[in-house]
């Protein structure tokens, strides 16, 4: 079903991050090419090695990887992506995207993408009810 499709899976700092390992596994079983981009805070909840093992691809965290291979990684990923799924999406990352802040690998890549972007919020109810989080239509997501 997803053979030949590239899914960028953004994982942010939320307790729900551990659940995304199962999602990555299901996407892989559907033959998707999965690139996992984690925020630094996400690594406090789940180890990048988990995603590397499940997807067979390097998990990207740092925007400026010292193993530079003659491509600007976030731009190359954005061009390859058929869809971006940010799950779990913390209030922090939603706020950054809504305001055009691109200060890590995930948000920088999202800013360069021209494909559909799906955001799956995961946060405290009061945080979720904040107008910035609620009005994702402002950023056409």
Residue ranges with predicted function:
Residues 1-40, 117-121, 134:
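N-terminal phosphate-binding or glycine-rich loops at protein starts, especially the Walker A/P-loop
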Residues 37-49:
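Glycosyltransferase specificity loop/lid
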Residues 46-47, 121-133:
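Glycine-rich, charge-decorated loop segments at or immediately adjacent to ligand/cofactor-binding or catalytic sites
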Residues 52-96:
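Glycine-rich oxoanion-binding loops at beta->alpha junctions
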Residues 87-90, 116-125:
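Short beta-strands and strand-loop turn motifs
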Residues 91-102, 127-130:
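Glycine/threonine-rich flexible loop motifs
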Residues 99-113:
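A short, gly/pro- and small-residue-rich
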Residues 139-141:
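Conserved small/polar residues in nucleotide/adenosyl-binding loops
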